[in-house]
Amino acid sequence: MEINGIAHTFVTVGDFDLSRAFYSKLLPFLGMKNVMDIPGTYYCVGGRTGFAIREAPEENRGDGFDQNRIGLHHICFRARTREDVDEAHAFVKDLGAEIVHGPEEAMWAPGYYSILFEDPDGIRLEINFVPGKGLLK
């Protein structure tokens, strides 16, 4: 069997209204279309995947995100060009995201180029570009 990508990712957020305001701008910028917007859930699809935020139960909202705990470390969205990464950097800065690093190359694959930033809960999000098939060639 060979998988055909990641079908969807759900992220649990502490302040749903704040996170919805953030993701309802970010995800459409990334070409994703909203398909569900109900109390406690905001879900978009596009680029052969889905991405959703869900409200944390009240008793868990104070815990906060820590990428070094067991579980999620970060999420990376794949861009089609280096210029897309540069454009995304300007967009997320204007959105008020905490920038971890601006556009830069990294050793993960030949031509790997990315930005890294945080959502309102401190969940790290990356947007990268890798030319050609990258490590899959």
Could you say what each language-model-derived stretch is?
Residues 13-18, 76-121:
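Vicinal oxygen chelate
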Residues 62-78:
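Helix-adjacent hinge/juxtasegments
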Residues 43-45, 64-65, 116:
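Short glycine-biased active-site loop of nucleotidyltransferases that positions the nucleotide triphosphate
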Residues 10-57:
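Core segments of cupin and vicinal oxygen chelate
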Residues 38-40, 73, 113:
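Residue-level marker for the onset of beta-strands and adjacent loop->beta junctions
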